[in-house]
């Protein structure tokens, strides 16, 4: 049985775009053309580098629904707690992608469109442009939800948060963060009942392993058991991941200096094997700012037919 939207193929790289609340560059705003021009790694759509923080006039794509006062973290660039300082060193650690329950951001999503994942070379640097309007664009709030109190909480006692994996499905990925990885513990439906989904991975899948830097590669294979739409299921999922490029990603929110994580997701049920490719674009503090997912059984590493394109928006 195929669970649509399963795994990183719907997010972060379900990282669910969990960037940092309180990201600070530690300096004044300056003019920019690309994220690489900025100490924060962020060139906003108005052509100005930010400090990007919860109280900045420029706005922050990710806010805390808990309403904590994080102005001190933002101003000092403290990497502890909710703060984060981008250093644009082409290495992203877990501390530079703070993820927790209670964050939300706006993402703009289009489905079944043409987009060349290879991007373009501009002045000897790779550039991907997702700032333009795409056919069928829809804005949606992506949230990192608390697991405590949810109907599935007892199945995932070590979880950090849950988040929706895909615009085309209401299934939630249940994630755990650590200094070395972002792991998917399982997939659940938002509500319990006769048609509920509650699938657990053993061992957990790791779509992201830290630190991220060009050339890093890892593979995880997980067996999954549980219920999908009320039906018992057993299958396996394999994630082949590699940080294969660095460059500049243009989004409706602004331009970011990013590392691109290439993921080949193989879903096996009995003798039926489905392969899906995805690219996650990850940057300091914001985390996953865009994801491009292929159609099923795409054979090309760089593809042009995308099942879903999701990127951060104002």
Residue ranges and their predicted role:
Residues 151-238, 243:
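Extracellular-facing segments of soluble proteins and assemblies that are Gly/Ser/Thr-biased and enriched
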Residues 81-159, 220-314:
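Acidic, serine/threonine-rich low-complexity disordered tracts
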Residues 15-84:
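Ser/Thr-rich, Pro/Gly/Ala-heavy low-complexity intrinsically disordered linkers and tails
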Residues 1-22:
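Sec-dependent bacterial lipoprotein signal peptides
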Residues 48-56, 186-191, 294-298:
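Secondary-structure transition/turn motif
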């Amino acid at each position: 049985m195929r669970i649509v939207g399963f795994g990183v193929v719907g997010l972060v790289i379900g990282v669910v775009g969990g960037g940092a609340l309180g990201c600070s560059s530690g300096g004044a705003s300056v003019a920019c053309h690309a994220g690489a021009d900025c100490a924060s790694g962020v060139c906003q759509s108005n052509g100005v580098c930010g400090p990007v923080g919860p109280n900045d006039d420029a706005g922050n794509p990710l806010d805390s629904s808990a309403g904590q006062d994080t102005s001190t973290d933002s101003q000092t660039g403290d990497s502890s707690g909710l703060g984060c300082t981008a250093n644009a060193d082409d290495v992203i650690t877990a501390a530079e992608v703070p993820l927790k329950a209670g964050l939300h951001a706006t993402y703009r999503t289009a489905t079944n469109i043409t987009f060349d994942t290879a991007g373009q070379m501009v002045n000897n640097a790779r550039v991907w442009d997702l700032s333009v309007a795409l056919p069928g664009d829809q804005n949606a709030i992506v949230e990192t939800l608390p697991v405590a109190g949810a109907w599935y909480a007892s199945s995932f006692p070590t979880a950090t948060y849950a988040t929706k994996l895909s615009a085309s499905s209401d299934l939630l990925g249940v994630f755990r963060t650590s200094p070395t990885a972002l792991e998917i513990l399982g997939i659940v439906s938002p509500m319990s009942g006769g048609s509920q989904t509650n699938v657990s991975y053993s061992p957990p899948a790791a779509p992201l392993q830290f630190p991220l830097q060009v050339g890093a590669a890892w593979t995880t294979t997980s067996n999954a058991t549980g219920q999908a739409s009320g039906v018992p299921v057993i299958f396996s999922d394999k994630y082949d991941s590699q940080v294969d490029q660095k460059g500049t990603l243009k989004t409706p929110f602004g331009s970011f200096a990013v590392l691109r994580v290439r993921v080949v997701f193989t879903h096996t049920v009995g003798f039926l094997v489905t392969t899906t490719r995805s690219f996650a674009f990850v940057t300091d503090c914001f985390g996953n700012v865009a994801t491009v997912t292929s159609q099923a059984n795409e054979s090309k590493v760089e593809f042009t037919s995308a099942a879903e394109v999701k990127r951060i928006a104002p």
